[in-house]
Amino acid sequence: MAAAVAELWETLKQAIVAYTGLSPAAFFTAVAAAAALYHVVSGIFAGPPPPPPPRPRDEPEAEPLPPPVQLGEVSEEELRQYDGSDPKKPLLMAIKGQIYDVTQSRMFYGPGGPYALFAGKDASRALAKMSFEPQDLTGDISGLGPFELDALQDWEYKFMGKYVKVGTVKKTVPVEDGAPSTSPETTETAAAAEPEKAPATEEKPREVSSEEVKEKEDAVAAAAPDEGAKES
């Protein structure tokens, strides 16, 4: 094999000398210089790169996000309306009773996102425990350990720095067993419905006329002589 390669190389050198009159070294140097010159010249006279392909007309452009709307104090039931199921409404989520607009992160908290279960809810307990269980999708953080509370604090700092606060979750006061759950308005209504008791009337003394007094005096005077006769 080596002998065949050496024989081929000798034949090539003889052909170069016979046809070009140059030595093999000079011939290959000239070929390399010609290739380099071609590369430089083609780079100078080459046209500009082609423009990028035009954007398809049927591809919709991303609409700008609407500005956050302040909701004030809302109930948990009202907060569920902003879970991303209605694309016309903002995407909201609450931590420790504070509601934030997370519309800009719809890919995470919107339908189909990894944290879609947290949208429209106060997910404080779930975030602290990094749980996706339904019973943890609540704002009740009682019984959490120090590490879980620290994790929840980190989430709150992240939301405060990235999202706009738009409201708070209305707190519900539980009714104790056996205690009446009447509101002040109900008490006032019941008091107004009771009939008013008429005050007891005092009997006024009957007025005695002068004729009645005179008749009594005459009767006493007539009875006086009879009593004197009985005594004698």
UniProtKB/Swiss-Prot annotation:
Listed InterPro entries: Cyt_B5-like_heme/steroid-bd (IPR001199), Cyt_B5-like_heme/steroid_sf (IPR036400), MAPR/NEUFC/NENF-like (IPR050577)
Transmembrane segments: 25-45
GO cellular component, as recorded: endomembrane system; endoplasmic reticulum; membrane; plasma membrane
Tissue: Expressed in leaf sheaths, leaf blades and panicles.
Membrane topology label: Single-pass type II membrane protein
Region of interest (Disordered), ranges: 48-77, 172-232
Keywords: Cell membrane, Lipid-binding, Membrane, Signal-anchor, Steroid-binding, Transmembrane, Transmembrane helix
Compositional bias (Low complexity): 179-193
Pfam families: Cyt-b5
Steroid-binding: annotated segments: 73-170
Location(s), subcellular: Cell membrane
Biased composition (Basic and acidic residues): 194-219
Main location: membrane
Record-annotated Cytochrome b5 heme-binding domain positions: 71-170
Cysteine-cysteine disulfides: none
Gene Ontology terms, MF aspect: steroid binding
Domain commentary: The cytochrome b5 heme-binding domain lacks the conserved iron-binding His residues at positions 108 and 132.
Annotated family: Belongs to the cytochrome b5 family. MAPR subfamily.
Protein name: Membrane steroid-binding protein 1
GN (gene name): MSBP1
